[in-house]
Amino acid sequence: MLKKLDSLLTVAGITLPDQQKHQLIGYVELLDKWNKAYNLTSVRDPQQMLVRHILDSIVVNPHLQGSRFIDVGTGPGLPGIPLAIVRPDAHFTLLDSLGKRVRFLRQVQHELGLNNIEPVQSRVEAFTSEPPFDGVISRAFASLQDMLSWCHHLPAKPEGRFYALKGVRPDDELAVLPEDIVLESVIKLDVPELDGERHLIILKSN
């Protein structure tokens, strides 16, 4: 699996220290093991997890600004855990409403020694944080409107950002953004061996 990860990283132009590579593989191994009982992801093949979960998450890293992030609707820790592994200088709160997912996240935290994550079981609308976050990250929401309405209280004003991971560029959604939200950028992400498009939408309060 290390060989596969190395080849994907090379194609993506990403260089990581060995410790981070081993943590990423350790995460895939835990996800594969727990998935059989907990049904955490529809991706069953660990080699595919490297593409669709690991690379798909860490390509976002260069575009994140700040040091305190929350991954909303993180599920089994995506994109939060891969990002936390490659950004040990930043802190990631991993929010999910399902207890079995949060139990898995705590196990990952323990086994991989990740001191920069905090798994939290909560519904997003009931969760508050002081101080607020530099960035709100999610690939879980069906629409940008849902993300903005559920998470409006989480980023610091005015400099905090929303980072939405989407497939095809959501032009219909971008055309109807609320008046108090400004589109900062739409970034086409290149994920090696991934079928379909990936875009990162970065939004700010104005």
From Swiss-Prot:
Pfam families: GidB. GO terms for molecular function: rRNA (guanine-N7-)-methyltransferase activity. One of its GO terms (cellular component) is cytosol. Specifically methylates the N7 position of guanine in position 527 of 16S rRNA. It comes from the Bacteria. Belongs to the methyltransferase superfamily. RNA methyltransferase RsmG family. This is Ribosomal RNA small subunit methyltransferase G. It is found in: Cytoplasm. HAMAP family: 16SrRNA_methyltr_G (MF_00074). Keywords: Cytoplasm, Methyltransferase, rRNA processing, S-adenosyl-L-methionine, Transferase. S-adenosyl-L-methionine binds at residues 73, 78, 124-125, 139. The gene is rsmG. Its EC number is 2.1.1.170. It catalyses: guanosine(527) in 16S rRNA + S-adenosyl-L-methionine = N(7)-methylguanosine(527) in 16S rRNA + S-adenosyl-L-homocysteine. InterPro entries: rRNA_ssu_MeTfrase_G (IPR003682), SAM-dependent_MTases_sf (IPR029063).
